[in-house]
Amino acid sequence: MNPALAARCFLMISFAGKMTDFAVSDSFRGVVDTVSGATPLAALKQNGFTDSSVSVLHMFIGDIQGTIGETSALAILIGAAILLVFKVIDLKIPLTYIGSFAVFVILYMLGTGKGFDVNYLFSHIFGGGLMLGAWFMATDYVTTPITPRGQYVYGVCLGVLTAVFRLFGGSAEGVSYAIIFCNLLVPMIERVTRHPAFGKGGKKA
């Protein structure tokens, strides 16, 4: 289990108010204040498809309020590109994670009769901890499968669970809980997806 995520989940459950405070800069007065309010993802959870206050562009560049790691998808992608260049991570888990999450959200939109809403989809992708979790947490060497097929299965499980927690759960977020839950499934995923040993089960001469 990822110890950092386990600690974050404990703090979120125990001190939810403090963990959702964020700094807001007043450009007219030149001051920074710390307030408690709804992040774009929380507003999306509360208002659903009708929330026009959520700007996908602002969420992408980071001009929004939010907790650490969820305010700038652009900064996260730059960091992810550096990790890819130096071959610290590969694309299997992040792309499978984000892709399966997007597919589930699209099916949810179509299934609820709301129709396809690209703003709603990308608000979920750029909002919250999905980007940070996909590129920096789900790729942790110690808590992820080592088999290629297992990494794809792991990514799909992450995407589906994150979507279920976000869309049907009581909280607006679900990335941390999804990763921790899938960490517990890693031994089983590796047993199912590992290649059989060469020559195992052959007939004796």
Protein language model features and the residues they cover:
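Hydrophobic alpha-helical transmembrane segments in multi-pass integral membrane proteins
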Residues: 18, 22, 108-114, 160-173
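Loop-to-transmembrane alpha-helix initiation sites
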Residues: 4, 121-128, 151, 170-182
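Structural signature of hydrophobic alpha-helical transmembrane segments
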Residues: 63-73, 118-130
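Short juxtamembrane and helix-loop transition motifs at transmembrane-helix boundaries
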Residues: 51-63, 79-87, 109-119, 135-145
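Long hydrophobic alpha-helical segments that form multi-pass transmembrane helix bundles
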Residues: 1-77
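Cytoplasmic-side transmembrane-helix entry/capping segments in multi-pass membrane proteins
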Residues: 1-9, 91-99, 124-127, 148-154
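Cytosolic-side transmembrane-helix boundaries in multi-pass membrane proteins
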Residues: 167-205
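Hydrophobic core segments of alpha-helical transmembrane domains in multi-pass membrane transport
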Residues: 8-16, 75-85, 97-107, 130-137, ...
